[in-house]
Amino acid sequence: MSNNATTYVVSPAPLKTTSTSSKTTFHFVAGLCSGLTSSILLQPADLLKTRVQQSHKSASLLPTLKTILSSPHPIRSLWRGTLPSALRTGFGSALYFTSLNALRQGIAQTRTPLAIASASSDGKARTSSSALPKLSNWANLATGAIARVAAGFVMMPVTVLKVRYESDYYAYRSLVGAGRDIVRTEGVRGLFSGFGATAARDAPYAGLYVLFYEQLKRRLASVASSEYSEQPLKTSSSSSINFVSGGLAAGLATAITNPFDAVKTRLQLMPGKYGNMMRAVRLMIHEDGVRSLFGGLGLRITRKALSSALAWTVYEELILRAEGHWAEQGKINL
């Protein structure tokens, strides 16, 4: 009997994998859309915050608003600086959400106990208002901080142009003219004025925000769902949970980090006077008191709460719908 039987080796069928390029592109587009929406709608609040924080006498909101409304073109004045603000927030959000997703997906794939939320073994909660990975508190804190600082550095020149253009200290007639003047008088370094204070503000803010946001989402989702329910949340419930969680998380993180924002504004407006972050803090307290470190807090909380709630709700909704569509098309495995 012959032993020369032919042996056939059958290769396993290729596993379906996530289209990394398409998912990355969609996260970028979703972040861009969410950032543009919030920045355009809330530009007046951002402009008022800049005007209040630039004052040496802790100007209050109502007189500042009255001055703007009494100008020849009040509506145009309230939306002054919308273009740089939209560019900064839109592309900044796109970079931030794309980077944040990449970091979170990478950490989730490690499946280590320190990285994944204890409520789930695979990075996905049973009942959730989100399609994003569920990470531990420290992982949320770290990924939020790293992604925000990275995006902030890339968008820093636009941020400086935005602040200078919104301020009434400078008579810039165009963004191009503002950029040329900054480079001519301060060099390229002038386009990164206040980055230290910005990073010191953004790192803890973004880290705390993601931490608070994920915790609030988890708790609100558990309240909205019946105990041990396997049913997914309704779209309206998910959007409401994300919106409320985004607003509350932004309010908490903003209140904690507002002094950094006040210092950052002064550094970007008058870098020659304030020099660096520590000098700015000393001068602000000496000239205007501790209260100056909390200038514009009410406006910033209002704007941040609304912008974060809008941005994250729009972003999460787009991602949730995309994940569902891709799953139905067989492009990804959930």
Curated annotation (Swiss-Prot):
- Molecular-function GO terms, alphabetical: glycine transmembrane transporter activity
Q: Name one GO biological process term.
A: glycine import into mitochondrion
Q: Where in the cell is it found?
A: Mitochondrion inner membrane
Its catalytic activity? glycine(in) = glycine(out)
Q: Which GO terms describe its cellular component?
A: mitochondrial inner membrane
Membrane-related topology note: Multi-pass membrane protein
**InterPro entries assigned:** Hem25/SLC25A38, Mitochondrial_sb/sol_carrier, Mt_carrier_dom_sf
Q: Which residues cross the membrane?
A: 28-53, 81-107, 141-166, 194-217, 241-267, 296-314
Q: What domain of life?
A: Eukaryota
What keywords tag this UniProt record? Answer: Membrane, Mitochondrion, Mitochondrion inner membrane, Repeat, Transmembrane, Transmembrane helix, Transport
Q: Name one Pfam family in it.
A: Mito_carr
Solcar repeat ranges, renumbered to this chain = 22-106, 135-219, 237-321
Q: What does this protein do?
A: Mitochondrial glycine transporter that imports glycine into the mitochondrial matrix. Plays an important role in providing glycine for the first enzymatic step in heme biosynthesis, the condensation of glycine with succinyl-CoA to produce 5-aminolevulinate (ALA) in the mitochondrial matrix.
HAMAP family recorded for this chain? SLC25A38
- Family (UniProt): Belongs to the mitochondrial carrier (TC 2.A.29) family. SLC25A38 subfamily.
Instruction: From the Swiss-Prot or TrEMBL record, give the protein name.
Output: Mitochondrial glycine transporter
Per the UniProt record, the source organism is Aspergillus clavatus (strain ATCC 1007 / CBS 513.65 / DSM 816 / NCTC 3887 / NRRL 1 / QM 1276 / 107)
